[in-house]
Amino acid sequence: MTLAGSKAFIGQPAPNFKTTAVVNGDFKEISLGQFKGKYVVLLFYPLDFTFVCPTEIIAFSDRIAEFKQLDVAVMACSTDSHFSHLAWVNTDRKMGGLGQMNIPILAYTNHVISRAYGVLKEDDGIAYRGLFIIDPKGILGQITINDLPVGRSVDETLRLIQAFQFVDKHGEVCPANWHPGSETIKPGVKESKAYFEKH
């Protein structure tokens, strides 16, 4: 895998885009800019009508209420057409389809979005399993890219967002395996000792 041509960097503005998506069984124009002011989870996946992909997209879609409670928008994106997306949404889940979706499914057949985010598998023209967390100011806070056979975790994505939001609000930092309610660290040489003395 190569990140050549990627414009996605931690701490920098996420590459903007505008494209057609399947939303509530219809076609709609979606842009990243319209979500300014809230966190965004952007999921790239390889192909419609495959095997791991529906398990991931359905998992995120079915738990959208938890993301909405945190004021987070979730979107999935592949290099398939919006017509392919719609056919997949209209396919029963027992037949490998998506069924009713609570998140937009973005289409971008010319590869511009997946290339900008550094997830395009150039030899096949499909996207690796990239997951990007973008903050309310449009800044990238988290990037993970999986190879094709391994899916991603909704629980870990929610945990990361909760950690970023805690830092935004309180200015303290979150140690390994932090969950809401766990101890955090005051970022300073002297201040951090209070945490380290307990652990």
From Swiss-Prot:
PROSITE patterns: THIOREDOXIN_2. SUPFAM superfamilies: Thioredoxin-like. It holds the Pfam family 1-cysPrx_C. It is an enzyme of class 1 (oxidoreductase). The active site is at 53 (cysteine sulfenic acid (-soh) intermediate). The keyword Acyltransferase does not apply. Its EC number is 1.11.1.24. One of its GO terms (cellular component) is cytosol. Keywords: Antioxidant, Disulfide bond, Oxidoreductase, Peroxidase, Redox-active center. Residues 8-166 form the Thioredoxin domain. One of its GO terms (molecular function) is thioredoxin peroxidase activity. It catalyses: a hydroperoxide + [thioredoxin]-dithiol = an alcohol + [thioredoxin]-disulfide + H2O. InterPro entries: AhpC/TSA (IPR000866), Peroxiredoxin (IPR050217), Peroxiredoxin_AhpC-typ (IPR024706), Peroxiredoxin_C (IPR019479), Thioredoxin-like_sf (IPR036249), Thioredoxin_domain (IPR013766). One of its GO terms (biological process) is removal of superoxide radicals. CDD domains: PRX_Typ2cys. Thiol-specific peroxidase that catalyzes the reduction of hydrogen peroxide and organic hydroperoxides to water and alcohols, respectively. Plays a role in cell protection against oxidative stress by detoxifying peroxides and as sensor of hydrogen peroxide-mediated signaling events. The active site is a conserved redox-active cysteine residue, the peroxidatic cysteine (C(P)), which makes the nucleophilic attack on the peroxide substrate. The peroxide oxidizes the C(P)-SH to cysteine sulfenic acid (C(P)-SOH), which then reacts with another cysteine residue, the resolving cysteine (C(R)), to form a disulfide bridge. The disulfide is subsequently reduced by an appropriate electron donor to complete the catalytic cycle. In this typical 2-Cys peroxiredoxin, C(R) is provided by the other dimeric subunit to form an intersubunit disulfide. Belongs to the peroxiredoxin family. AhpC/Prx1 subfamily. Homodimer; disulfide-linked, upon oxidation. This is Peroxiredoxin 2. It comes from Brugia malayi. The lineage of its organism: Eukaryota, Metazoa, Ecdysozoa, Nematoda, Chromadorea.
